[in-house]
């Protein structure tokens, strides 16, 4: 099975509408942790995103001279077309942003939401942040939390931990 794990950082929470938020960075890794794509983009609509910047640390000047996501769409489509499984933390959020730019997983791809699986494991009805799930499993961060590559690696670690736990049961 060809599995990928990915994360995005965005200008906000809403990929659709008259003033849509946009993807600033996307990182995609294979199940073995190899980096398939790790890119930043200049938004085409938004000129500032102070609330998102406070979380993800990406400011307009950081991406002002970068290409737009349009340059990466062929590669994104290729990666998602080859994936039998797509893993993410609150994956619907990220998939919504990809869908807004015309990138979707295959219809027969398994969509694995590590946040939902971790919440089920914990037996609670609240949403666990990725940093909390990673802390719970003793994950040591490589990079800054809320960076797309660091978050993709942490998501994969939590997913692997959950799968090992399920096998042990």
Predicted regions and their residues:
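Conserved non-catalytic scaffold segment of RNase H-like nuclease domains
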Residues: 1-108, 123-124, 131-146
